A protein has these predicted regions:
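Structural motif
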Residues: 77-78
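Short amphipathic alpha-helical segments
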Residues: 17-18, 91-94, 203-206
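Catalytic phosphate-donor-binding core of small-molecule kinases
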Residues: 3-9, 14, 23-26, 41-69, ...
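Conserved binding/recognition cores within well-folded domains
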Residues: 193-196
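Short, well-ordered alpha-helical microsegments
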Residues: 87-89
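A short, gly/pro- and small-residue-rich
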Residues: 92-106
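N-terminal glycine-rich "phosphate-gripper" loop used for MgATP/nucleotide binding
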Residues: 81-85
Length: 285
């Protein structure tokens, strides 16, 4: 079995890299910001330990950091992602048909709604190796969203798309075409969410009840609407929802809060159910 093992950076690693700071400089910054230095360093050590243990147990796998990805992943039988939900959705943008397993690398600090295994200790990693060796897992097909803006395909969304103004203080405006009816809306933006994303942003903004990631439909919610006749609904397979932008400041769309696309006045977006994401569901040993 050819496995690609992908890991997130710890907060400490990422900020040293991005800010080009020495250890002492970053610690000084954390102290100035009243950050919990002990918790940050404990999480860093946990990430390093889990990463090292996975490399030692899965000796034949190829390893990379998530931000080293640049093209669609091919030539592997499965992908394993070490991190949290954000790392999982990031990597999912590079996956088409290959089964993927999200692994919570720090379950004490991360909920990991989208992750189907947890690295609670070293034994849990050995157990996962046994699960894979004996094929004790199934595949669940999670619904994903796809979209075009002005005819150009954008990245799929595992959790959600957002369309609106970049700045919260600016009103988002668009025309929503849903099931042959048009609605001109003023709001704080519109969210299109899958079952995988239904426990996150859309739930927090509108308290919608979550649904299973494998359910073959998506939902949408208009956030903070002003006198709107249509504040939400379902999107079924074969349906297509159209959005015409009336944003005149910094209108944009985002996919899983990772990738961004311009969505200014006059732009047209079409949103629909796309190809599913194949999720590995281990059977506990």
């Amino acid at each position: 079995v050819k496995i690609l093992l992908i890991s997130k950076h710890s907060k400490y690693e990422w900020e040293r890299k991005q800010l080009s700071l020495t250890h002492d400089e970053l610690v000084s910054k954390y102290n100035k910001e009243r950050a919990n230095l002990d918790a940050i360093m404990e999480a860093h050590e946990k990430q390093l330990h889990v990463r090292t243990t996975f490399k030692r147990v899965f000796t034949d796998s190829k390893f990379c950091m998530m931000h080293e990805l640049s093209d669609t992943i091919t030539d592997y039988d499965m992908v394993m992602v070490l991190g949290g939900d954000n790392a999982f959705t990031y990597v999912s943008h590079y996956i088409k048909n290959i089964p993927v397993l999200g692994i919570n690398s720090d379950p004490d600090r991360s909920t990991g709604h989208l992750l189907k295994w947890s690295a609670t200790d070293d034994q849990s990693i050995f157990d996962l190796a046994e699960v894979i060796d004996f094929h004790h897992y199934g595949i669940s097909k999670w619904t994903r969203l796809e979209a075009t803006i002005d005819g150009k395909v954008i990245s799929p969304a595992t959790s959600e798309y957002f369309f609106g103004e970049r700045m919260r203080k600016n009103m988002s405006r668009h025309i929503l075409v849903y099931r042959d009816k048009e609605y001109e809306q003023k709001c704080s933006g519109i969210l299109f969410t899958t079952g995988a994303g239904s426990t996150g942003w859309a739930h927090s903004s509108s308290n919608i009840p979550p649904w299973d990631p494998s359910d073959k439909y998506a939902g949408f919610v208009v956030t903070e609407p002003y006198m709107s006749e249509c504040n939400g609904g379902e999107l079924l397979p074969g349906e297509e929802l159209t959005l015409y932008s009336l944003n005149d400041s910094e209108g944009y769309a985002s996919s899983d809060s990772w990738e961004e696309f311009e969505f200014m006045r006059g732009s047209e977006a079409k949103i629909y159910i796309g190809s599913p994401l194949n999720i590995m569901i281990p059977k506990r040993v």
